[in-house]
Amino acid sequence: MISLRQLHYFVEIVESGGFSRAAERLFVAQSALSRQVRELEDSIGTPLLRRGPRQVELTPAGRAFLPRAQRLLGDLEAARRLAREVGEDGHGLLRLGHSSSVPLVGGLQAALRGYLAVQSGVRLELTQQSSEQQLADLAEGRLDLGLLRLPVLRQHPRLHLRALYREPLLLALAADHPLARREAPVALAALAGETFVSIPHLQRGGLSYRAAELCLGAGFYPRPARALSRKTSQLQLIEAGFGVALVPASMRAIAPPAVSFMSLAEAEAYSEVALAWRRDDSPLVEGFVEYFLENLPNEAKD
């Protein structure tokens, strides 16, 4: 008989990339993990994983089984949360993810603060994640809502994705950089010789992907710096002189004092922020979405 624990362990092994990392994340011994997966395979009657010396691969049966196992676990978590929310009569927990390039300042902060003031029985749990990871966790029930940067590379049919506003992109650079002395906006083509502290990941969209699109439109691909970051720590790398980056204007609010910001000459130098949530989610999530879309201050959309 297949158990939920076996499903959970199987999915975690695949998403973690192997038994060792999954065991660390689950706080169980690898031997126990292996035993549960073998029992799952015995119950199904066919192998789901190929165990190599360094990595684990899905068999054809495993590839067919994985999305259904993920969906089952996500549906179970959604059902559990819905029952708890109904029983708590307006009280509950909302798990909100946000990209590192979507700092919760200004209008976003005001909207969150306003929601919590109206819904005094609700708690928010905030997690900083990449746009693509947010979508995966939303689809699988590990997050309730996500604030992310477009574009995203994967479409999830079970998710709503609502663009909220466009935000100007600025050139972030060290205060002593020669370009920081300019008064006129900087053309993207002038950055062809610069090194960038954030470049696209092959399997992620978001801000770095959008920045690379703009650079390609100006005739070059961003040259990687020797020190790279996909988090807000890129501002510290810029401050240290490792390179430059295209960042949203809202990141000025969290930047070190030795980082300067320059306007870009191109009208298309902007990035979009979006809100994501599951289509079949709970009244608590739907209530948050309705409030958030109606009460996001205008300055967040400028």
Predicted regions and their residues:
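A late-sequence structural motif
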Residues: 250-251, 260-302
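Short helix-boundary/capping micro-motifs
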Residues: 11-32, 53
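Short beta-strand-centered segments that line the small-molecule binding cleft or hinge
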Residues: 110-114, 130-173, 182, 239-242, ...
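Hydrophobic/proline-rich hinge and linker segments of small-molecule sensing/allosteric domains
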Residues: 160-201, 270-280, 293
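Secondary-structure junction motif
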Residues: 106-108, 185-186, 194-218, 285-287, ...
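A short LG(V/I)-centered, amphipathic sequence patch enriched
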Residues: 41-63
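Alpha-helical linker/hinge and terminal dimerization helices associated
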Residues: 7, 43-44, 65-87, 100
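N-terminal winged-helix
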Residues: 81, 88-119, 123-127, 132-136
